[in-house]
A protein has these predicted regions:
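Sec-dependent N-terminal signal peptides
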Residues: 4-12
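A cross-taxonomic marker for long C-terminal extensions/tails that follow the last structured domain
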Residues: 18-28, 97-104, 109-171
Length: 171
């Protein structure tokens, strides 16, 4: 009987340890009894490409990246085995700028995505800005939120991430 209890505790341990969500208040997800199961020990490296800003609400492209993390952790993948990057160009770059720079570009409004981005950065999500697009939009590196990375271009960021084993989100 003692061995059965020990075995039950050991089997339940990983499930209890991997409950999500990682992010509260954004990145909504649903537990799924999946047929295509993530192999144990597999590290998921995934990159999203986001171009469009959504000035009056959280950026749905950024939130999709959070959902990817939340859904996989809630379905048993250890948080340490989920790596996400977001390559940003176009008007979405504004949503990665500090409050004064954002307000100056958006009629004094507050950045609805800022708190979400900061929390995601704290959890290891990489936000990488296309340097070519930033230059074209007049965004300086010093205006970016702390932790946001600047690449030569979105293309070079994707090439580097692909070489590091990241898959590109197809939609």
């Amino acid at each position: 009987m003692r061995r059965l209890l020990l075995l039950a505790a050991l089997l339940a341990g990983p499930a209890l340890a991997t409950d999500g969500p990682v992010f509260m208040g954004f990145g909504s997800h649903t537990p799924v009894e999946a047929d295509l199961v993530i192999p144990k020990g597999m590290v998921l490296r995934h990159v999203y490409d986001v171009t469009a800003a959504t000035p009056d609400k959280r950026n749905p492209g950024f939130e999709t990246a959070a959902r990817f993390i939340n859904s996989h952790v809630a379905n048993g993948v250890p948080e340490r085995d989920v790596a996400v990057a977001v390559v940003v160009h176009g008007s979405a770059i504004d949503e990665l700028t500090r409050a004064p720079a954002y307000a100056a570009r958006n009629g004094g409004k507050a950045n609805a995505s800022e708190a979400m981005v900061i929390e995601m950065l704290k959890k290891g999500v990489r936000f990488i800005v296309c340097g070519q697009a930033a230059n074209a939009r007049g965004v300086k590196k010093a205006e970016l939120l702390p932790g946001v990375e600047l690449a030569i271009s979105a293309s070079s960021a994707h090439a580097i991430l692909q070489a590091q084993g990241y898959s590109l989100n197809p939609f």
